[in-house]
Amino acid sequence: TLSSSSAASDVYKRQVDSVEDKPYTRRPAAPFTTSTLQQEAARKLRMSSRVSMQVAQRLYENGYITYMRTDSVNLSQEAVQAARRQATELYGADAVPAQPRVYAKRNETAQEAHEAIRPAGDSFRTPAQVKAELRPDEFRLYELIWKRTVASQMADAKGYTATLRLSATAQDGRLAQFSASGTVITFKGFLDAYEEGRDAEVDGENAEAKDRRLPQVAQGERLTGDPIEATGHETSPPARYTEASIVAELERREIGRPSTYAPTISTIMDRGYVSKRGTALVPSWTAFAVIGLLEDYFAKYVDYDFTARMEDDLDLSLIHISE
């Protein structure tokens, strides 16, 4: 390591001291549920939860996609075959695994009354085939759904995770040592079609480093690069929620249903409890006052587990009625 920025700027003669490789495999993401569609539309398309559901509603009503309020990641057999067939046609036979992929429930309370969100029909229309028929926002959301569905039936991406150890000699003769870790992809698989987004502010630098792509280098290889600059780092507080991350948190805590995620976010924004600063959701002073009041006088009803317990009680009631 370097102790000062002046020493850093003097470094030259960089070379690779060692390369440690470990096998890397990455599976495609499951087809869309309501919550994951809202999260991806927020990250990739900058659509709010309300807008993404309005656009999805139009696509569904006009016969372009299946029902958009669902907590299931399962596809019908016809949809699985359509996705595999289209992946083979577009990306080659190697892009599809020998057996169809089956995805497990995201959580135990998933009702799975409908299949996952996907292009409609037993033979998918490509984005290029429907572009002239759709409005720009409809086309972008359809393309996102189509890519995710096709990719969900494609082969794993494969490669290796490399840890590089580098050394360099400064002009004053001191030895500087560095290390870098990242992923080298040797077979793209589903990445040819689609790569799942992430909320960078929430996942942080560790997740970014895990999937950082490195060039292929060999031990002893001489390297060139930009001038080295030493920078300081400080611990940051937890990031504010975005629409994507708050939907994920609602689902994780089993608060609400797929049909209530977008209305819940819309309600707290319409009432002035939160506002948007960039993509972040920032609470107002009114929100703090309301939360304090509710916690003091209605603690039972604002407990995070209340909804899950109520759902369980309703399920038990239905069982007793059926008996």
List each language-model region with its residue ranges.
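N-terminal alpha-helical segment
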Residues: S4, T33-T34, M310
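Eukaryotic nuclear/nucleolar intrinsically disordered, charge-dense low-complexity regions
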Residues: N62-I65
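Short alpha-helical scaffolding segments that buttress acidic/His motifs in well-ordered protein cores
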Residues: V55-A56, I145
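Short Gly/charged-rich anion-binding patches and loops
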Residues: A7, T36, Q54, S245, ...
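Single conserved hydrophobic/aromatic residue that forms the stacking wall/gate
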Residues: T1-A8, Y12, I319-E323
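Basic, low-complexity terminal or inter-domain segments flanking catalytic cores
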Residues: Q15-V16, E20, S48-R50, M68-S322
